[in-house]
Regions:
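Conserved nucleotide-binding/hydrolysis micro-motifs of P-loop NTPases
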Residues: 24-25, 50-51, 75-77, 105-111, ...
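Amphipathic, soluble alpha-helical interaction motifs
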Residues: 57, 100-103, 131, 143, ...
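Conserved G1/Walker A P-loop phosphate-binding module
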Residues: 1-113, 122, 141, 147
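Flexible beta-alpha connector loops of hexameric P-loop NTPases
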Residues: 76-83, 117-132, 151-157, 213, ...
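Short amphipathic alpha-helical segments
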Residues: 30-31, 112-116, 218-220, 250
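C-terminal-of-GTPase-core extension/linker across diverse P-loop GTPases
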Residues: 2-8, 13, 19, 146-354, ...
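Short, flexible surface segments
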Residues: 96, 356-357
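Switch/coupling subdomain of P-loop NTPase systems
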Residues: 88-89, 95, 99-102, 107-135, ...
Length: 367
């Protein structure tokens, strides 16, 4: 299950610099709009210290972490919803992602131009939000006309549910709010909402790009964004992308840690961002551990054992019999699977077991 996040923002806010930090691919970080014309795509690993600690005990042939696909989407501009700049193409690229990483410029630097001439991340956020909202309204109005006719002609229950969902979204978007602020109670409404694939319904992480001096505590710009994000239930984080790029170029782990300590940081902003993006979509990890490999597998929080078995192979889900489960802490404390069995800590779970983050799983199946 590959997580796909799109990095968006106005030109020259630090998107490509951030992408360079996240991925080994080098996007062209140029000081002019549209330097990212085709979306740059990079596959990055999700940091997970548990895999390394397990590998020290299991001695596998390899370690396979979970991965996340990052797409650097070219700079949006005012009017993108009407095709300004490269608007239609950019908005289409956003639609293909699972979550949005919205980069906002929260630093002063007279050597880096801003398309509107001044630094105002609140205004920048509103520009991008407005373009996405206008595109969503266009989608809704087109769909609403069609579904209203279907609901009226045949007394179609599904069409009526979708009409109610569309009208709820329309009312919110017309107020300049994002679709993600709307909550639906029934499963039917939730399913109808999910199938619309609205841009502003996607989970979003607002990344406040700051200078090195503000890397630890943020600044007045970031605090304004935090207040706005709280109102719509969105996540925020502070990162100094240029500094992170410098850290990424250091050779040794020790040098990187020393640099972070000098800034008063325990973990790199890149690692924090990847973890936040992972949790943004309500994703967790279970682990398989053996002589061949220690591997992280991604699943949706709340999934039961058969569904997680299906992540490895569809046959595992179809022929699921049971799951043998070891808690990560037990494995680390006792040192081996044999010791866990001997201590009576190996769980035998059936089809109703809800898998927990960090569970070490072995599935029994028959096809």
């Amino acid at each position: 299950m590959a997580l796909k996040c799109g990095i968006v923002g106005l030109p020259n806010v630090g998107k490509s610099t951030l992408f360079n930090c996240l991925s080994s691919a080098k996007a062209q970080a140029a000081n002019f709009p549209f330097c990212t014309i085709e979306p740059n795509v990079g596959v990055i690993t999700v940091p997970d210290e548990r895999l390394t600690k397990l590998a020290e005990l299991v001695h596998p042939g390899r370690i396979v972490p979970a991965t996340c696909e990052i797409v650097d989407i070219a700079g949006l501009v005012k009017g993108a919803s009407k095709g300004e700049g490269r608007g239609n193409k950019f908005l289409g690229n956003i639609r293909e992602t699972d979550a949005i990483i919205h980069v906002l410029r929260c630093f002063e630097d007279e050597n880096i131009t801003h398309v509107d001439g001044t630094i105002d991340p609140v205004r920048d956020k509103e520009i991008i939000d407005t373009e996405l909202q206008l595109k969503d309204l266009e989608t809704i109005e087109s769909r609403l006309q069609k579904q209203q006719k279907i609901a009226a002609i045949g007394n179609n229950k599904d069409a009526k549910i979708e009409v109610a969902v569309l009208e709820a979204y329309k009312a919110v978007l017309e107020q300049g709010k994002n679709a993600r602020t709307v909550e639906f109670d029934s499963k039917e409404e939730q399913d109808a909402a999910r199938n619309l694939f609205l841009l502003t319904a996607k989970p979003v992480l607002y990344v406040c790009n700051v200078d090195e001096a503000s890397a630890k505590s943020g600044n007045e710009f970031t605090r304004k964004i935090e207040e706005l994000a709280k109102e719509e239930g969105a996540e925020t984080m502070v990162i100094a992308a240029k500094t992170e790029e410098d850290i990424a170029e250091l050779e040794s782990y020790e040098d990187k840690q020393m640099f972070l300590e000098e800034l008063g940081l325990e973990e790199s902003g890149v690692n924090r961002l990847i973890k936040k993006a992972y949790s943004l979509l309500n994703l967790e990890t279970f682990i398989t551990a053996g002589e061949m490999e220690v591997k992280a597998w991604t699943y949706h929080k709340g999934w039961k054992a058969p569904q997680c078995a299906g992540v490895i192979h569809t046959d595992f889900e179809k022929g699921f019999i049971r799951a043998e489960v070891i808690k990560y802490d037990d494995y680390i404390q006792l040192g081996s699977e044999a010791a866990v069995r001997e201590a009576g800590k190996l769980g035998i779970e059936g089809k109703d077991y809800v898998v927990q983050d960090g569970d070490i799983m072995h599935f029994r199946f028959n096809v």
